[in-house]
Amino acid sequence: MMPLTAAREFMRLLTGRFLATRCPQVAGSLAFTTLLAIVPLLTVIIALFSNFPAFSRLGESLRTFLLENLLPDRAGQIIATYAFQFSQQAAGLTLIGTVLLVLTALMLLMTIDHVFNHIWGVRRPRPLLTRLMVHWFALTLGPLALGGSVLATGHLVATSIALAGEGSWVGATFARLVPTVLLGSLFSVLYYAVPNHPVRMLHALAGGIAAAIVFVLMQRLFGLFIVRIPTYTLIYGTFAVLPIFLVWLYLSWVVILLGAALSATLPSFFERARILRAFPGDRAWAAVTMLIALADAQHAGTTLPFATLQAGARVSSNEGEALLGEMRDAGWVAHTEEGNWLLSRQAAQIGLAAVVNRFALSPAAWREASDGDEASRRIAERLATALHSADLPLSALTSAGNRVQTG
């Protein structure tokens, strides 16, 4: 019963995150963006391989891998063939045209970056210059790394088949598994490196492997659907290539985003036993707990890692990131270059009332919501008075402050 309950809880968390971040709608947007950016992406990749003849075999291996494993039969391969032809003709573009192509490719990568950060609940992405540099390296070095991996595994498969024999089931099974493993590795790298959020390698691998398996199954089912139910071909004729390819892109992005949501959900799922049960004012309690820990660290002249703050406040990693992000917006905390956290002002300058006002009960918001109602206005004033009377500086709540009061 317990494993079934845990599985049900995990599916609830996964479905909640997948829908809350609007992944089905975002997948549609990414499908159209990919359709627009596919030629610019291929242009940059082909230019990279053509300018370095030593990498020509890598380029050919990458092209074969894309056609055989990432695209549906017929429609995808027709689109890819035209895209490769257009990309090769792009060599005659002017400087402005080339810049526009590169910018279009970078825009797709930046859109993916934004979507992944949203799934992980990241409030602040990397600085723009850092993102551009990361995306440029991904655009230039990524195809080389993927092409090298495909070429190396191709040699490995050929060697395995030669050792096991031409008709051996071992070689055939290995040849079928390798593309799935490569896809899983590619997705895992995406889930690990793209979000501006600490992601455990094990969680990224789990999401990547799950997405790769679902992707391969979806590819087979999609191929069977197109062959057995040729509705698009009957209605659109030759033009059926485009809607079929768009549907394929949409389903592909749904699978990729589902894998990302799975990777982002795993920490919350494993932390659920340590997370404090929800109660009125729980966010204010967690924020005060974090601030007191940071005030103690400030007194000791140290900083604290996120894991320590999260464990002390007994919140999920996503909620902890959100709380710290809001406190950073308020000017109370700051993020160090090493990845730790510290108070950005003296503990005596942060009041308990300000924290409660931001995370639990805001008299100002109550007053604004009253819409001129006299009773609501009077209640808001009394709440503000009560908060002011109960206010304490954060320094009075720290270990050092408690010792002073006790003494």
Curated annotation (Swiss-Prot):
Q: Which HAMAP family match?
A: UPF0761
Keywords assigned by UniProt, alphabetized: Cell inner membrane, Cell membrane, Membrane, Transmembrane, Transmembrane helix
User: Which GO CC terms are listed, alphabetically?
Assistant: plasma membrane
Location (main, coarse): membrane
Family the entry assigns? Belongs to the UPF0761 family.
Give the location in the cell: Cell inner membrane
From the Swiss-Prot or TrEMBL record, give the protein name: UPF0761 membrane protein AZOSEA40600
Residues passing through the membrane, by range: 29-49, 92-112, 132-152, 174-194, 207-227, 239-259
Signal peptide position in this chain? none
Membrane topology summary: Multi-pass membrane protein
Species in which this protein is naturally found: Aromatoleum aromaticum (strain DSM 19018 / LMG 30748 / EbN1) (Azoarcus sp. (strain EbN1))
